[in-house]
Amino acid sequence: MAFFQNTRKPEGLGGKLMVTMMNHGHASLSAFGLQHIAIQENASCLDLGCGGGANVKKLLARSPQGHVTGLDYSEVSVAKSRKCNAAAIEAGRCEIVLGNVMDLPFPDDAFHVATAFETIYFWPDLAQAFAQVFRVLKPNGLFLLCNEASGADAKGAKWASLIEGMRVYSSEDLRRLLRQAGFSNLKMSENPKGWLCIVAEKEATPQPKQPL
């Protein structure tokens, strides 16, 4: 099952194939998630775990006068995402950064919107990562999180057994961790396939962080 390890961190030829597959395979999930969030035309957006860059391209379309940053810790993903969004990068509307969600290389209050599609399964410390997302969002900024596996059926457990370092979180786990990071006004949506979408807000007057 070595090929499937590329879902966690694409590397080599297998990784190049995987990010291409992800750009197509995650299209329906991103469409499901993006319908739940309003994005201003001039928004500054951050796509975490940007993979092959397809969702960066969608965010650019949703904010035609804004700027989109993609971040991934895979060099293969960064290269593919830069190629996918070359025109926007040339126009100064896009940047793809090699980095880690555990220590985001951005200043406080930098983005209106942050997104994470099919990626948090592989974040080693979700509490720390969510705190980083909270930090870089502007007041009233939104965090959109979308997963195909929500722990509601055996599908997620099967994939977690095949892919080293993968963990599937329940909706309650995610609610608790997001609130602990300071997020509020959480809105959760699920579809008949079991896909999960959560939109969380960084209020202008943040709520007290809740203990784990």
Name these PLM-found stretches:
Residues L46-D103:
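Class I SAM-dependent methyltransferase SAM/SAH-binding core
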Residues A127-P139:
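A short glycine-rich, Lys/Arg-flanked "PGG" loop and its adjoining helix->strand segment in the class I
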Residues M102-V113:
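A short acidic, Gly/Pro-enriched loop at the edge of an enzyme's catalytic core
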Residues I198-L212:
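C-terminal lobe and adjacent flexible extensions of AdoMet/dcAdoMet transferase-like proteins
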Residues F4, P10-N23, A27, L142-V199:
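C-terminal alpha-helical "lid/dimerization" subdomain adjacent to the S-adenosyl-L-methionine
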Residues H24-A43, K58:
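Conserved alpha-helix/loop element of class I SAM-dependent methyltransferases that forms part
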Residues H112-D125:
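A short SAM/SAH-binding and catalytic strip from SAM-dependent methyltransferases
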Residues N42, L137-L142:
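Short glycine-dipeptide loop
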